């Protein structure tokens, strides 16, 4: 019927997760409604993006051949489920058919807060959450000097990678002459936390400058007593240096986990965590999924 897989039902994400559990995956996180929203296996995980897009996060591996093998094994699992249920797997950077209002948001507190905040800072944030799909690659670094070299180079090359891997020319059933609707969507999502920042292109960049940048970005939420509390009125710097007016936030002591969560809500084209994450490519067909980490491996190492 040309519709996305629903979150729950006889043929759904929940049903797919049960199928994957039979293939050796273990149950992971549950939402507030006791519904399964992630799986894990041998250091890898399967999670859900806001519009039920599947995300495989592979385990740490030594080379791109191992990464490709792991990816193909998972894709074959999905393909088997798809054939059993007359489904089609689409490898594109943007949903070619569905309208935004037709897509179901998964019930997850973090995504609820983002859903309410996105329209305040851009016109396409909800499209980003529900209609985009990407291939990303993560790389280690030896020390700060090595990190800076890789980070700056990766930022400088991102426009080239975006062009090479552009693969989303269709929107709502028609070709709209935009080679990557995914990139077009990101350009008006949230300029504060997205894109390529000027300071990221300079060889004088260092970790302190990235921290300064991240501190200025609005914080989506704090998890207090098991609940996600909306903090989008505050940057992380505000939470550290000012006294919030809300009683539950004011009485809460920030932790390292809050900072780590905050870093995960920064959506620049190259993201810095305990590893380097390159994020500029559209999703594509199977061989292109492996091509992206191979491309970056040849450049960064």
PLM feature spans:
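Loop-rich catalytic cores of soluble enzymes, especially ATP-dependent carboxylate-amine ligases
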Residues: 83, 94-271
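Glycine-/small-residue-rich active-site loops that bind phosphorylated ligands and cofactors
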Residues: 63, 142, 284
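Short helix/loop capping segments that flank catalytic or ligand/cofactor-binding pockets
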Residues: 6, 64-66, 147-149, 162, ...
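Terminal accessory/anchoring regions of large secretory-pathway or extracellular enzymes
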Residues: 13-14, 23, 247-256, 261, ...
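Short, intrinsically disordered, mixed-charge
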Residues: 22, 80, 156-159, 163, ...
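Terminal catalytic/cofactor-binding subdomain
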Residues: 1-123, 131, 280, 288, ...
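Short aromatic/hydrophobic contact patches that present stacked aromatics
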Residues: 55, 136-138, 277
